[in-house]
């Protein structure tokens, strides 16, 4: 029985469709470089993020990038992986691996680093198909230092002065005060003496004193005699004397109860002489 053979053009077309750029370059038999891990020494403060960079050039579809930490027994402990390995749910979420946009660099970060995170770290690349290969990077060290509390900046206290210098300062201050007091007394004495001299000079010369706001006012008392001239009174013209009119009444008291005698009247208009009265008639006369 003869096996049918595919025509050559069909085989050529299948080969063209199945080929992609770099397929031969990514051959598993071709040697590839191990990843790089930097920086070699990373020092951070407690509570800050610590970030390493792992660079891997052979990023084919079938690879895994792991992040390791060396244990005290010199064994590798897997912290995180890219792509993320969901088969190990107990991993610490503080350790993260993130691919950068260029596709070859990966950030491996410790979020909020602790003091016990200090140690040795490295990254490892695993190629799965068609043959598994594992290559590790060089090791790097992480140091997490203690965070110190920020002490508020205090103003430097002045250095203590010696006792002799303090006594000198006190003596200087007291001397300055005494000197100021003496100067003030001298100024007041000069002002008062000048004011007194000006007062005496003004009294001697008879000139009025000029007002001095700084001088003490001095009061003087002068005694004199006041002379009032007598002014004679102007004689007034004589006033004509008008004779006063006086009326006289005579009351005659009769001697008997049954007899009566006529009364006599006199006035100033009549004659001045009065008629004689009888002795038996009692009478009293007074001016009206």
UniProtKB/Swiss-Prot annotation:
<feature type="compositionally biased region" description="Basic and acidic residues">
    <location>
        <begin position="278"/>
        <end position="288"/>
    </location>
</feature>
<feature type="short sequence motif" description="ITSM motif">
    <location>
        <begin position="247"/>
        <end position="251"/>
    </location>
</feature>
<dbReference type="GO" id="GO:0050868">
    <property type="term" value="P:negative regulation of T cell activation"/>
</dbReference>
<dbReference type="GO" id="GO:0001783">
    <property type="term" value="P:B cell apoptotic process"/>
</dbReference>
<keyword id="KW-0597">Phosphoprotein</keyword>
<dbReference type="GO" id="GO:0070234">
    <property type="term" value="P:positive regulation of T cell apoptotic process"/>
</dbReference>
<keyword id="KW-0325">Glycoprotein</keyword>
<comment type="function">
    <text>The PDCD1-mediated inhibitory pathway is exploited by tumors to attenuate anti-tumor immunity and escape destruction by the immune system, thereby facilitating tumor survival. The interaction with CD274/PDCD1L1 inhibits cytotoxic T lymphocytes (CTLs) effector function. The blockage of the PDCD1-mediated pathway results in the reversal of the exhausted T-cell phenotype and the normalization of the anti-tumor response, providing a rationale for cancer immunotherapy.</text>
</comment>
<feature type="glycosylation site" description="N-linked (GlcNAc...) asparagine">
    <location>
        <position position="49"/>
    </location>
</feature>
<feature type="cross-link" description="Glycyl lysine isopeptide (Lys-Gly) (interchain with G-Cter in ubiquitin)">
    <location>
        <position position="233"/>
    </location>
</feature>
<feature type="disulfide bond">
    <location>
        <begin position="54"/>
        <end position="123"/>
    </location>
</feature>
<feature type="region of interest" description="Interaction with CD274/PDCD1L1">
    <location>
        <begin position="70"/>
        <end position="77"/>
    </location>
</feature>
<keyword id="KW-1017">Isopeptide bond</keyword>
<feature type="topological domain" description="Cytoplasmic">
    <location>
        <begin position="192"/>
        <end position="288"/>
    </location>
</feature>
<feature type="transmembrane region" description="Helical">
    <location>
        <begin position="171"/>
        <end position="191"/>
    </location>
</feature>
<feature type="region of interest" description="Nivolumab binding">
    <location>
        <begin position="25"/>
        <end position="34"/>
    </location>
</feature>
<keyword id="KW-0053">Apoptosis</keyword>
<keyword id="KW-0832">Ubl conjugation</keyword>
<feature type="topological domain" description="Extracellular">
    <location>
        <begin position="25"/>
        <end position="170"/>
    </location>
</feature>
<keyword id="KW-1133">Transmembrane helix</keyword>
<dbReference type="GO" id="GO:0002644">
    <property type="term" value="P:negative regulation of tolerance induction"/>
</dbReference>
<dbReference type="GO" id="GO:0006959">
    <property type="term" value="P:humoral immune response"/>
</dbReference>
<keyword id="KW-0391">Immunity</keyword>
<dbReference type="GO" id="GO:1902482">
    <property type="term" value="P:regulatory T cell apoptotic process"/>
</dbReference>
<feature type="glycosylation site" description="N-linked (GlcNAc...) asparagine">
    <location>
        <position position="74"/>
    </location>
</feature>
<dbReference type="Pfam" id="PF07686">
    <property type="entry name" value="V-set"/>
</dbReference>
<feature type="domain" description="Ig-like V-type">
    <location>
        <begin position="35"/>
        <end position="145"/>
    </location>
</feature>
<comment type="function">
    <text>Inhibitory receptor on antigen activated T-cells that plays a critical role in induction and maintenance of immune tolerance to self. Delivers inhibitory signals upon binding to ligands CD274/PDCD1L1 and CD273/PDCD1LG2. Following T-cell receptor (TCR) engagement, PDCD1 associates with CD3-TCR in the immunological synapse and directly inhibits T-cell activation.</text>
</comment>
<dbReference type="InterPro" id="IPR013783">
    <property type="entry name" value="Ig-like_fold"/>
</dbReference>
<dbReference type="InterPro" id="IPR036179">
    <property type="entry name" value="Ig-like_dom_sf"/>
</dbReference>
<keyword id="KW-1064">Adaptive immunity</keyword>
<dbReference type="GO" id="GO:0050776">
    <property type="term" value="P:regulation of immune response"/>
</dbReference>
<dbReference type="InterPro" id="IPR013106">
    <property type="entry name" value="Ig_V-set"/>
</dbReference>
<dbReference type="GO" id="GO:0006915">
    <property type="term" value="P:apoptotic process"/>
</dbReference>
<dbReference type="GO" id="GO:0002841">
    <property type="term" value="P:negative regulation of T cell mediated immune response to tumor cell"/>
</dbReference>
<feature type="modified residue" description="Phosphotyrosine">
    <location>
        <position position="248"/>
    </location>
</feature>
<dbReference type="GO" id="GO:0038023">
    <property type="term" value="F:signaling receptor activity"/>
</dbReference>
<feature type="signal peptide">
    <location>
        <begin position="1"/>
        <end position="24"/>
    </location>
</feature>
<feature type="modified residue" description="Phosphotyrosine">
    <location>
        <position position="223"/>
    </location>
</feature>
<protein>
    <recommendedName>
        <fullName>Programmed cell death protein 1</fullName>
    </recommendedName>
</protein>
<dbReference type="InterPro" id="IPR007110">
    <property type="entry name" value="Ig-like_dom"/>
</dbReference>
<dbReference type="InterPro" id="IPR042379">
    <property type="entry name" value="PDCD1"/>
</dbReference>
């Amino acid at each position: 029985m003869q096996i049918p053979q595919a025509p050559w053009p069909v085989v050529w077309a299948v080969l063209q469709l199945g080929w992609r750029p770099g397929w031969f370059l990514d051959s598993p038999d071709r040697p590839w470089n191990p990843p790089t891990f930097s920086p070699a020494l990373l020092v951070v403060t407690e509570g800050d993020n610590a970030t390493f960079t792992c660079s891997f050039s052979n990023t084919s579809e079938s690879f895994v990038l792991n992040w390791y930490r060396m244990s005290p027994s010199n064994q590798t402990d897997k912290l995180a992986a890219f792509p993320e390995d969901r088969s190990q749910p107990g991993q610490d979420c503080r350790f993260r691996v993130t691919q950068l946009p260029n596709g070859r660099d990966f950030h491996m970060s410790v979020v909020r680093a602790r003091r016990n995170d200090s140690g040795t770290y490295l990254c490892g690349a695993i190629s799965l198909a068609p043959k598994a290969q594992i290559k590790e990077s060089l090791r790097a060290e992480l140091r997490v230092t203690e965070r110190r509390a920020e002490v508020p900046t205090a103003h430097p206290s002045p250095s203590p002065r010696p006792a002799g210098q303090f006594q000198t300062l006190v003596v200087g201050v007291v001397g300055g005060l005494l000197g100021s007091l003496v100067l003030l007394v001298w100024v007041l004495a000069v002002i008062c003496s000048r004011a007194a001299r000006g007062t005496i000079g003004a009294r001697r010369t008879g000139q009025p004193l000029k007002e001095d706001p700084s001088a003490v006012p001095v009061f003087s008392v002068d005694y004199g005699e006041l002379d009032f001239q007598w002014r004679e009174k102007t004689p007034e013209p004589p006033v004509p004397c008008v004779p006063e009119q006086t009326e006289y009444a005579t009351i005659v008291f009769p001697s008997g109860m049954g007899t009566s005698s006529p009364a006599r009247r006199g006035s100033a208009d009549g004659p001045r002489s009065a008629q004689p009265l009888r002795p038996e008639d009692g009478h009293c006369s007074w001016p009206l």
